Curated annotation (Swiss-Prot):
This is Small ribosomal subunit protein bS18. The keyword Nucleotide-binding does not apply. Belongs to the bacterial ribosomal protein bS18 family. Residues 1-82 are annotated as: Disordered. It comes from Malacoplasma penetrans (strain HF-2) (Mycoplasma penetrans).
Length: 154
């Protein structure tokens, strides 16, 4: 009977030692993760400090070259457009004037909205809003009927 009790005692001792060993490994693993977290945090802070130092040195250096447009390969294409977006958006000239009604008798205005072949120019060319483009085109058609503007170039 003594052998049975010793086996049970050794079995219970081994289970307790296994549990203790498992707890120790868990503690070690948590320590490792916390140390790696702290070490990465330290590395990150040192890296951010280095970056700020580099930025400060870049700002403090006043050894800039003078701007020469010939140094750029496509400098001739950028002339006249100093901003990066390019051209400014066109707007309707009739809206800017505040002119609501387009008179068919105003031939000078109507010729501005015609092509050299006396066709009605598109909105892409005239930069007119849709409201004024339709009013101008109707006025041109009326002026053609009344013979103020010819239908075809002679």
């Amino acid at each position: 009977m003594e052998k049975k009790t010793t086996k049970k005692a050794t079995a219970s001792k081994t289970t307790t030692t296994k549990k203790a060993a498992a707890e120790k490994t868990e503690i070690k693993e948590t320590k490792k993760t916390t140390t790696t977290k702290t070490s990465t945090a330290k590395k990150a802070t040192t890296a951010s400090v280095e970056k700020t130092e580099v930025k400060e040195t870049k700002k403090s250096s006043d050894n800039k070259k003078e701007f020469n447009p010939q140094d750029r390969p496509f400098a001739k294409y950028n002339r006249g457009y100093p901003n990066k977006q390019g051209r400014r958006k066109k707007f309707c000239k009739l809206c800017a004037k505040g002119q609501e009604h387009v008179d068919y008798k105003d031939v000078e205005l109507l010729y501005k909205y015609l092509t050299p072949n006396l066709k009605i120019a598109s909105r892409k060319i005239t930069f007119a809003c849709s409201k004024h483009q339709t009013r101008v085109s109707n006025a041109i058609k009326r002026a053609r009927i009344v013979a103020l503007i010819p239908f075809v170039r002679d």
